[in-house]
């Protein structure tokens, strides 16, 4: 009888395999070094992870939708389950989008998650770039990562635009007609040829959506995926930036190791992002194409706006004056200038680090971030750009604003035009002066200390507020001014611990009984001291010659 073999131990098998690999290729040293890499713990560094995890959700949901979507523009008659559109002639693309929404199991849920994830992806990139811009994280040696992030934002905008154009509903068709077709036709010399190359003839043609589909599911996602991989590789190789603080220098990183803290935190954050997108996809309706109907070139609807990341271009087209220019017997209509300004923005965005380096002469390596107040010109430029974006975004919905607030549509158009010219410089000035004021506030704390709120009367009758110095004092008791290190400064006594430590309770859990009793006793003692001081003050007044009458 053969001996009975015991089942193998999985842990021992894996350990043996790992040892065999290590004896051949020696990866353990490099792997240990990489797993010990330190990442900062500031919350703003998670903004980039939101974009990354949203893109992962986009890939997963996009693959599912690809299994059921047909990008053909062949005309068919709808005979599906949605009764109001039965018998209506539409494209095969629109019919398959309706089938995904009403007949594919989980199709509407996945489609809405996909759309919300696209919005979150673009929004996260915008906020992430804003954080990098205002803190100076794009400075040398990280200019390449800024360029990659700018390209990711531009690609995300066009990827989203192509994506919501695929269903061939009335709203997406209007977007293609107004943005892609009209601007292309208006280009001098090459406009007609380029339009026929894109559409295969007159608008809308029969080949545009299949071409957009190929760009949307193959080319652009591949480029975005490659850029994300390159971005992460550069972050890993160049190490992370960090905010100034105790123990932080240009040559180290203070934070937590990749394993296990950062890895578990990132995994939990990914689960949270997926959960939030799932709730949004299940509870918040977005892009109800069945209410819009199929695209018909003869039908135009008011209240037509693109997604938020393209609304600034729509607003620019709405408020741009109807100026026509003539150059070498060619007409340049107003919509072409929208494309020109878009191109200018798309060039200035990735080029900004090099422009700032050129004008400031700062060619040094930087691993410590800056507070926005410490760089008022850059902060003011960023605030001006945000104001420009917000004005154009609001201008994109001027018809809805005019309808809801009973304002003339022409008035909203002129408000947008005036705001585009006046508001950005005004915001620049206010932001610049605000930063200067914050700098002076920091210098005041370093020179005089923190305001205590205690008013003291001097022997000659003047009143002053006492300050708590942050450092040593001279022989006269005056604070010795400290040097600003770029880190946040305490502005209130509570920051120095004068209010004591907070209780262990929270919004959901009360303090412990012993801690609650101690807090009550301390509060009662403080009240008794205040009453005693008040009585002493009143007695001194009553006992004075002025108080005897």
From Swiss-Prot:
UniProt xrefs under SUPFAM superfamilies: Transmembrane di-heme cytochromes
Keywords, comma-separated and alphabetical: Cell membrane, Electron transport, Heme, Iron, Membrane, Metal-binding, Respiratory chain, Translocase, Transmembrane, Transmembrane helix, Transport
Cofactor notes: Binds 2 heme groups non-covalently per subunit.
Reactions listed under catalytic activity: a quinol + 2 Fe(III)-[cytochrome c](out) = a quinone + 2 Fe(II)-[cytochrome c](out) + 2 H(+)(out)
Gene Ontology molecular function terms on file: metal ion binding; ubiquinol-cytochrome-c reductase activity
Membrane topology per record: Multi-pass membrane protein
Protein EC: 7.1.1.8
Transmembrane helix listed as a keyword: yes
Named cofactor requirement(s): heme
Residues given in the record as heme 1 binding sites: 114, 216
Cross-referenced InterPro entries: Cyt_b/b6_N, Cytb/b6-like_sf, Di-haem_cyt_TM
GO CC terms of this entry: membrane; plasma membrane
Compartment(s) where it occurs, according to its Swiss-Prot or TrEMBL record: Cell membrane
Regulation: Inhibited by the anti-tuberculous drug Q203, an optimized imidazopyridine amide (IPA) compound. Q203 triggers a rapid ATP depletion in M.tuberculosis grown under an aerobic or anaerobic atmosphere. Also inhibited by LPZS (lansoprazole sulfide), a metabolite of LPZ (lansoprazole) generated by intracellular sulfoxide reduction into the host cytoplasm; LPZS is a potent anti-mycobacterial agent that inhibits growth of intracellular M.tuberculosis with good activity against drug-resistant isolates.
GO biological process: respiratory electron transport chain
UniProt function note: Cytochrome b subunit of the cytochrome bc1 complex, an essential component of the respiratory electron transport chain required for ATP synthesis. The bc1 complex catalyzes the oxidation of ubiquinol and the reduction of cytochrome c in the respiratory chain. The bc1 complex operates through a Q-cycle mechanism that couples electron transfer to generation of the proton gradient that drives ATP synthesis. The cytochrome b subunit contains two ubiquinol reactive sites: the oxidation (QP) site and the reduction (QN) site.
Miscellaneous comment text of the record: Was identified as a high-confidence drug target.
Subunit structure: The cytochrome bc1 complex is composed of a cytochrome b (QcrB), the Rieske iron-sulfur protein (QcrA) and a diheme cytochrome c (QcrC) subunit.
Protein family according to the UniProt entry: Belongs to the cytochrome b family.
Entry protein name: Cytochrome bc1 complex cytochrome b subunit
